[in-house]
Structures are given as C-alpha cells and as structure tokens.
C-alpha cells in the first residue's frame, strides 16, 4: 500500500484471495472491475494464492480466506494471518461463488471508505453481517435526527377500534376453531430481556441502605418510596419465598439477635441480598421468562410454563402447538431447563404435543454507536461500539418463521390459572384475522383472474375502508381502470395484524392512533410517547385524549393470497426509531434503536384494532406486581 489508506489517501489497496483452487483468473477478472471511484484516486489490486502452498503469508491490506468451514488448512491460515496482524476475512462459500463473494466484499469496502471509515471498521461491520447501506442510513439519522410522529387523532371505539361483545367474541373463537386445522399456527414470545428493572428498587435498597446506621423503616422514610415496604410485607406470598428464605436464614448478620427490630431488619436485608446478589440467586440478571412467577401445588411456575399452557389452549391444531422464543444467547441453558421442565407438565395436563425453538437477536440488526460529534465511537483505537437494535430488530426473527398465523405476546404478560378470558379473546382475534384474510384473498384472486368489474371494485373499496380502516386516495375515481386494479392490489396485498387494545388506565407505553404519513394519508399505528413531540400543544392534546393502551396482544398473518411468505422488511418505516443517549466509559454516546416491533417495524401492515378486556393484560413490570390477584393462587 503506497499511503495510509485509513486517511483516504490510498493509491492502491492490495487484497489477497486465498482459496484451495487456482483463483488467479478470478483475481484478474476482479482487477478489471471499476470498484473505486475515479475521484478518489484509489484502486483495488487483487492477487490470488493457493491455501495449500502458503507457509508465510505476506502482508496485504486485506486477506480473504475462502474455503468450506471444515477446511483445516484454511482455518490454520486464517489463524496465522490473524497472528501476523494481517487484516483478514474468513469466508465460508462454494468455490463457484468466489468472484461474486469477493465482488460483494470489494463493493462494501468501497462504500465504507466513501463514508470515511477505516478498513478495520469495515472488517468489524462486515463480520456482523451489517451492510454499508444500513450504516450510511444510521449515520444520517444521527446527523438529521428522527422526525416525530404526526398524529391526526386517537383511535377510539367506532373510529379505529372495534368493540366486541362477549357473544361476538365467542362466535369468532368458534369460527377460528373450525378453521385452525388449515393453518400453521405459531406463538412468538420476545423473551430476551433481563429482569433488572423488575428489581430496581431492591438494588437501590442494597446500595443505599447501611444497616449499621439506620433501620429499614428509617430508610423507607428517607427515600420516600413505599415499594420496599410492600415487598417486605408481602414477601411470604412470593412463589420463591421459601427457597430463598432457607438460604438467607443461614446468612443473617445481626449485632444484637436479642433485639427483635434489629433481628427483623437483618432477616429482611439478608433475604433481599440473597435474592439479587450474583453469588446466590442473582434474579436481577436473569431473564424474566425463567423466574418463578406463580405458586402452584408442588411447584413454582415460570412465565415460560404459562406461555406454553396458553399456546396449548389457543394456538394448537392437530394435537400440537409450536412456540418460538427470542432469547439472549447467554441464557440458553437456563431457558432449555425451564422449557423442558414446563413442557413435560403442560403436555401431561393438556394432552397437546409442544414443539419449541429459539432464536437470538441477530448481530446484523445491531446498530453503530456514535459520539456526540456523530462520528463512530471507538472503545479502543480501532474497536467500534455496537448496540443491540432494540425489540424492533425482532422483525427479522419474525420474518424467518414459517407460519400462517402467529400469536405475539410479551413474556411477562401472564396470569395464574384462570385463562378462559385470555383464550377466548386470543381465538377471537385470530377469528377476525382469518375472516379478513379470506375476503382479502378472494378479492385478490378475482382481480388477478380478471373476474372483478369496475362496479365490484367499489365494493372492495368499501370493505377496505370500513373493515380494514384503510385511507383510500381521494383521487381513486380519477384513476384509469388498470391503475385502479393495481392500486387496490397494492393496498390489500400486505401482511395483516389484528391487535388487542385495553382501556387506558395510566399504564406507560404505546397507544392506538390515526397517523398522517408523508403524503397526508392516514393509517392506524401503535405510537410510543417517545415518538411524539409533547411540546407541541396539538400533539400533546391528541395524546392525552387516547382511550386505549397497547398491551402487545397481536395475531398476525404472514403469508399472501398465494401462500408465499411476505418479506416483512419491506413494510418497515425505516425513518422511525429512537435515538438513545448513554454513558460509556465516562463518555456520552448515542445509539439508534430500530423502529419498534409493533411500531415502525409494522408500519406498512394492514392494521385492525379490537378492544379486549383488561383481564387479558397482567404484566409484571416490578416484582411487587406478583402480589396482585392475577398472580396469586386462587382461594
């Protein structure tokens, strides 16, 4: 290399291709490709080497080792290149694809250099599977910011939200039961989040309380938070009480065991410490999904158990059910233990065969962190900082499922024993989805086969407006007949989601609104408070008038009228999302969270909102929520 390429003054960037076969013709062909822009005065120079003939690989700006994964010589060479501080990529691909693969890498490398990134940056980004187009988009978002959502009005009963009487819900649930054998059903449960916030007030207690200087009562009066008192008064009602108390009793340290008040404080302190400290139960660092939530005769049930039981009740067909959890890779073993234990119990109770699988949040959905200057943040001289993309990244996990109908629900929204209402309304939402799909699919098939005349198009438009809440273009009547067909097809041929909404009782989070898009068209969206300009009096007023809340209770149709899977990435509003500022190593950094799974990630879906009873919403946001009736053993 003739000059420091990291400063973008490179004349020639040398790239060596290592493969098992003769790749010199490929290198020659690559050297004819115009990868670099002439204005940069930069050229990529490709050379080829046989893996088996290389003992001491020479330094190059980038080494690409291409061979099957099990190729020992290739793996040894890759390791040797790494030890020699050679920048290298280890690529697993067939030899027939060498030209295409290296061309792809070279194109991405050029884009990285165009963005002012260094080659070491490119390596880290490419290995994660992140494209340079995504990086460019993310950097532009940091520079330009994210526009706030423009709400037109809240969705309410009769204007965006359908009210279901119990008789209607029962009829829809029965309808779904008659149809479900024709569908691949799956339950999708985001479950990767740790329980840190669930125990936050207990962490605050452990760090802020000094047993040698004050009583617990004095601490609670000082911090003016009764959460700890509620926890301690109700501790014997928690399903984990006996197990933790048995260990905690042995660890009590009290200077005066004869003093009842001091002894009681010491007992409480030991219980909390045993529950959340790393050396004992470490509950705060475990996922919510595998913690004991409910006390049953003979065992404590985890959310995993409750979700499997729910799946057997409303997401089963032909005597089996399929459940998919998105989890943190670090907690795989804990989930496997929890699921295998729960599966045996639920199968014995219900007679339903349970199939389950996991995915992790994909590394390719991580986003690049930047400093306050909007330049990539480096933890060390060359190490970029990547952050998880938030739950919106799970649209990629959802996109990989093979299912017709998918039930989505958060891991912490479960209840003890009584599931009749939950089951009824989940099936009712699925019944609505199936009914709507049957109509949509019939219309699309008829349009494709030429069976729809212009008068019948008006019927379809009425259906789209009244039952799908679609905002049809006011210029529709001016379209040519051919354009009308195309427009209707584009409006209908999209994934459908039917979302349960509960009456707003002050819970934090998103709600249902009519939102104006770029061209002034309205659509139903689930909007988070962080997406709204609350300093704008009109928008703040609209937000305050919301009557319903999003409990994350969705039933989704993932296939089109021909039985093909939709590419869900095509329906994401990439201009939404969240910029989050955090401290890293004493420095402020910004990260971009992708559009939320049920927010911008599904912005382009056909959306139907339906009111469901508050009984179906029983989240556990803090450990004290487990003391509520929905989480206690019925009397």
Task: Describe the predicted segments one by one.
Residues 154-199, 203-505, 509-526, 530-535, ...:
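Domain-scale recognition of functional cores that engage charged ligands
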Residues 78-113:
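Ser/Thr/Gly-rich flexible loops in soluble cytosolic domains mediating phosphotransfer, phosphorylation
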Residues 33-58:
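A short, well-structured beta->alpha microelement
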């Amino acid at each position: 290399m003739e000059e420091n390429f990291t400063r973008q003054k490179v004349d020639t960037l040398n790239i060596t291709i290592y493969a098992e076969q003769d790749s010199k013709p490929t290198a020659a062909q690559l050297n004819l490709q115009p990868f670099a822009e002439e204005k940069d005065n930069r050229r990529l120079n490709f050379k080829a080497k046989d893996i088996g003939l290389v003992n001491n690989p020479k330094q190059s700006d980038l080494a690409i080792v291409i061979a099957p994964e099990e190729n020992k010589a290739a793996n040894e060479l890759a390791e040797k290149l790494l030890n020699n501080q050679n920048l290298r990529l280890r690529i697993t691909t067939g030899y027939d694809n060498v030209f295409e693969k290296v061309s792809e890498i070279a194109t991405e490398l050029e884009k990285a250099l165009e963005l002012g990134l260094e080659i070491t940056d490119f390596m880290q980004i490419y290995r994660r599977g992140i494209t340079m187009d995504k990086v460019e988009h993310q950097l532009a978002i940091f520079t330009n910011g994210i526009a706030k959502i423009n709400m037109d009005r809240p969705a309410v009963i009769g204007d965006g939200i359908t009210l279901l009487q119990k008789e209607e819900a029962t009829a829809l649930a029965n309808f779904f039961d008659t149809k479900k054998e024709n569908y691949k059903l799956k339950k999708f449960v985001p479950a990767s989040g740790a329980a840190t916030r669930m125990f936050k007030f207990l962490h605050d207690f452990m760090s802020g309380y000094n047993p040698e200087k004050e009583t617990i009562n004095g601490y609670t009066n000082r911090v003016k938070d009764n959460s700890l008192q509620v926890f301690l008064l109700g501790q014997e009602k928690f399903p984990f009480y006996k197990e933790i108390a048995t260990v905690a009793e042995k660890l009590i340290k009290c200077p005066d065991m004869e003093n009842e008040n001091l002894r009681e404080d010491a007992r409480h302190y030991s219980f909390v410490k045993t529950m959340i400290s790393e050396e004992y139960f470490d509950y705060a660092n475990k996922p919510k999904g595998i913690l004991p939530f409910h006390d049953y005769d003979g065992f404590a049930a985890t959310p995993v158990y409750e979700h499997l039981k729910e799946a057997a009740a409303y997401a089963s067909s032909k005597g089996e059910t399929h459940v998919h959890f998105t989890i943190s890779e670090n907690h795989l073993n804990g989930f496997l233990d929890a699921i295998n234990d729960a599966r045996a119990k639920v199968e014995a109770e219900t007679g339903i065969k349970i199939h389950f699988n996991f995915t992790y949040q994909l590394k390719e959905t991580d986003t690049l962190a930047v400093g306050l200057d909007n330049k990539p943040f480096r933890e060390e001289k060359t190490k970029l900082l990547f952050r998880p993309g938030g739950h919106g990244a799970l649209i990629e996990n959802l996109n990989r499922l093979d299912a017709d109908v998918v039930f989505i629900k958060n891991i912490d929204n479960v209840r003890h024993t009584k599931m009749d209402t939950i089951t009824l309304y989940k099936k009712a939402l699925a019944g609505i989805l199936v009914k709507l799909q049957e109509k949509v699919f019939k219309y699309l098939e008829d349009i494709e086969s030429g069976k729809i005349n212009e008068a019948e198009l008006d019927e379809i438009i009425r259906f789209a407006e009244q039952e799908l809440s679609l905002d049809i273009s006011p210029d529709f009547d001016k379209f040519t007949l051919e354009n009308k067909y195309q427009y209707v097809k584009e409006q209908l041929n999209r994934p459908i989601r039917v979302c349960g909404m509960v009456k707003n009782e002050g819970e934090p989070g998103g709600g249902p609104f009519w939102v104006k898009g770029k061209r002034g068209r309205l659509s139903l969206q689930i909007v988070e408070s962080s997406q709204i300009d609350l300093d704008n009096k009109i928008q703040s007023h609209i937000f305050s008038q919301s009557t319903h809340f999003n409990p994350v209770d969705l039933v989704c149709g993932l296939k089109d009228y021909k039985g093909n899977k939709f590419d869900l990435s095509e329906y994401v509003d990439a201009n939404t999302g969240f910029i989050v500022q955090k401290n890293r190593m004493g420095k402020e950094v910004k990260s971009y969270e992708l559009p939320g799974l049920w927010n911008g990630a599904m912005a382009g879906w056909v959306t139907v909102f339906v009111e469901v009873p508050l009984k179906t919403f029983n989240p556990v946001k803090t450990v004290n929520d487990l003391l509520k009736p929905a989480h206690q053993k019925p009397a």
